[in-house]
Regions:
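Serine-hydrolase catalytic machinery in alpha/beta-hydrolase-like enzymes
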Residues: 1-97
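Glycine-rich His-Gly loop
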Residues: 29-32, 110, 156-157
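Short phosphate-binding/catalytic loops that engage adenosine nucleotides
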Residues: 50-51, 100-101, 176-177
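A short beta-to-alpha transition loop/helix N-cap that caps and shapes the active-site region
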Residues: 61-66, 137-143, 161-162
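Primarily recognizes the serine-hydrolase "nucleophile elbow" in alpha/beta-hydrolase
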Residues: 89-147
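Short beta-strand/loop motif that positions the catalytic acidic residue
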Residues: 147, 153-155
Length: 186
């Protein structure tokens, strides 16, 4: 599905609808490999749970199977953060205005977890829930204070981001946010 456009380039993603009337919408953000078959399958599973799910393509048609290629794609993305944020905003607008869902959450894994949080920070009064699977975080408490939605995060205790998640959890507690960060052994 084409859900938006910026700088003359269409934003294309993978859209999945539930069999029944959707309960809510989800912006689904891929890990650093790109919008691949794994994300398509996850998007379908989320639709099976009742969500209108839009898996965005932050790499604009590219994907990787090798670490060096994924690293290059993620670096290029980080060098053009505004374009990525525009992409997420247009996904939100598509779900809200074209699909017609009232509540919209955002979920991402790894690189997608990073952008899930950034999308929530961009739309702190519009996003209704944020899910972060082991993505790099924002450590600025002033920015985190703007978040108004429930936040859930997941990270392994041996993950390189483990300590960052401990601080993130404490910051959210200090700010009295509705947040639940889960730490898994391994």
């Amino acid at each position: 599905v084409i859900y938006g456009q910026s700088q003359g380039q269409s934003h294309k993603g993978f859209f999945s609808e539930p069999n029944d009337k959707p309960t809510s919408g989800l912006i689904v953000i891929h890990e650093w490999w790109g919008l691949n078959e794994d994300i398509h399958l996850m998007n379908e599973q989320l639709a099976g749970l009742g969500y209108s799910s839009l898996a965005v393509d932050l790499y604009e048609g590219k994907s990787a199977t090798k670490v060096k290629d994924a690293f290059q794609l993620s670096t290029n993305l980080s060098n053009n953060e505004q374009r990525a944020l525009d992409n997420i905003k247009q996904a939100y607008d598509y779900l809200k205005n074209e699909v017609g869902v009232e509540k919209i959450g955002i979920i991402g894994w790894c690189l997608g977890g990073k952008w899930s949080l950034r999308g929530a920070l961009m739309l702190p009064r519009d996003i209704d829930a944020t899910v972060i699977y082991y993505g790099s975080l924002i450590e600025d408490k002033e920015r985190l204070a703007t978040l108004e939605m429930p936040i859930i995060g997941f990270v392994g205790t041996k993950d390189r981001l483990h300590k960052q998640f401990i601080q993130f959890d404490q910051d959210l507690k200090d700010l009295n946010k509705d947040a639940s960060i889960h730490f898994y052994q391994g």
